[in-house]
């Protein structure tokens, strides 16, 4: 699952996902900035503190979103590429998993976001 606009209410959202049988969530991110909202770049199981319960919901942290770079931070193509490079290098050094979010409009052939995405694919190999 991924919540639209990355809007989650912890623990309510996660409890509802568990109730519906969802096993993975990709909403743990900041909409307006890059970075790992939970401080981790590896998936982890949601632990319900209020109920002192281990769950089977795997939270997969999202490192960056196309809209963050383009709309919120107003980065140029080169600035976005530099940011992606730093993030991918950091995740590789930690042995983590780099997950990003790209909207379909970012894949227009002449889009700067498309070029950044292509660079990301090469960098992450």
Regions picked out by a protein language model, each given a short descriptive name:
Residues 78-125:
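C-terminal domain-boundary segment and adjacent tail
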Residues 2-91:
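Active-site-adjacent pocket scaffolds in enzyme catalytic domains
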